[in-house]
Amino acid sequence: MVLGRVSRRALLVGGWSILGVPLLAACLGRGKKKDGSSGGSGSAGASGGSGQGVTRTVTTVGASLEVTVGPAVVSDDVMVVPLAVHLNKMGSGGLSSDGKKFDVHLAWSGTGNFTGADGVRLVDFDADTVQETFKASSESTGLTKEEPDTTLHALFKPVSAKTINILVPESGLFEGVPVVRDGKLSDEAKKALEDVYDTESSPDPVALETFTASVDGASDTRVTGKSVVINLASDVLFASDSADLSAQADATLNKAAEQLATYPGGEVSIVGHTDDVADDAHNLDLSKRRATSVSDRLGRLTNMSAFSVSTDGKGESSPRAPNDSDGNRQLNRRVEITLVPTQAASSTSSPDASKGTGHGSGDLPKAEGPVAKGSEGVTVKRDGRQDELTFVLTEVTRRGKYLVGEVKATGGPGGTQTGPADWLQPTQLAGSARGEEDNRLTSAVTGLSLLTPQTRYYPADYTTARGSHCPLSEITADNQLGAGDATTLTVVWPDTGQDTVTLDLQPAEHSTPSPNNPFRLTDIPVKG
């Protein structure tokens, strides 16, 4: 039996999948029940105390909702964030039962063992961190015309901040939610905390990371709180089976040198890697010689005296992807430069951004699909299907080192057969923009990048408790949209340093059963 992509709503039956095992969705972990937890001193929906919640009218999987987040209330070892929701208008998409009931608890859940608001995340742009819920309560609630109101609760480890930013699945970012200390519990909060589960996510804030790639495919860069990793494609630097730098190598190495030059000093390791085509000994020797060639050339292109530099080679022993296809072998043929800086970079702006114009030097690469201004939107049709979606992004907001955008996706006549995430995959099937294949990201929005003439900026991400990378974007946008139904897809990108940005979706590199359909949105203003 062959199964197509099915939404979590279709799969969830009492918290179990159609295959008879717990269903894991995207990044958040499998829940584990904790008998007798909470002891009645968690908190939410404070009945008294200072501060008001943050209210927005949002569009979520076709439904119009008025959502009030907060105030968050801290008591003992838990901080509870209430999400009060009022149904303004029903949709006809994947979470609307016969147009009579909207299952908001499925829109905001993040795991398959229970439903509720465990998919909600806390974002601290000043500290460059994200925090997942570490406990969850199964709160199954359907909103109807007769009963349009409910409250769900997201449970976090307490933080010291006076206000917090809450990212709600397919509903947007709620900024400045007040935090109340030692507040009293509402009756709804007490009920929610009577039966809670561990989500198996990290309870502590996790550092945000950024991932960018050169437009020509010659390099990509990952920046974490501790290091900068620049991957250089060996196919650009060297001829096959050679350690002599090509005529094209300097263009790529100069970009790497510019990145290193933004740091005052640190430790730099340069490591060569190969695919598995030749034998181990040959690959190890080749990788070491290639690392030495890159190190020597960098030393002539820029002053490396502030850095402690080492070289090594690992042959085929540390592949970036399985050596099971030509595309993956190409990813594995690389030279990896890792910098552990002594201090932060001297500038947070990108080297190819020209502030004030919204464009770096040179022209953007040719668009592969329809193009329109972000405020006007583009309509994308699926090959061989009647499905169509319209994507609009009117603006992005600058928050610290990041840009926050809320992409509106609207279903065309007849609705869609799959959720928006199926349309927005990166160039690698069932994987992340990094090229890491991960089936848990099949419902995540990972392919949308901000494009400059030289660089693609992919969604910021972070390392989960399981060691995989989770994007700071929608992670379960898998519900179908009815005709005219819209939903909100929030994405957080690294700041490009521009006043206007371009949103771009690349075509898939390989033939897939459900290929994405590329498009481009231009002239998107940056606010804040």
Where would I find each of the regions flagged by the language model?
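N-terminal secretory signal peptides
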Residues: M1-V6, G15-P22
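Short, low-complexity, disordered segments immediately C-terminal to signal peptides
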Residues: L28-Q52
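Low-complexity, acidic Ser/Thr/Pro/Gly-rich terminal tails and inter-domain linkers that flank the onset
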Residues: Q52-V74, K373-R398
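Surface-exposed edge beta-strand/loop patches
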Residues: G53, G142-A207, P341, P365-V378, ...
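Short, well-ordered beta-strand segments enriched in hydrophobic/aromatic residues
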Residues: M79-L87, L403-G411
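The feature marks short-to-medium sequence segments in extracytoplasmic or secretory-pathway proteins
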Residues: N88-K145, K255, Q259, G412-L481
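Periplasmic peptidoglycan-binding/anchoring modules of Gram-negative envelope and division proteins
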Residues: S214-S227, L237-V271, S295, G299-R300, ...
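Periplasmic OmpA-like peptidoglycan-binding domain that tethers envelope proteins to the cell wall
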Residues: H273-P351, T357-H359
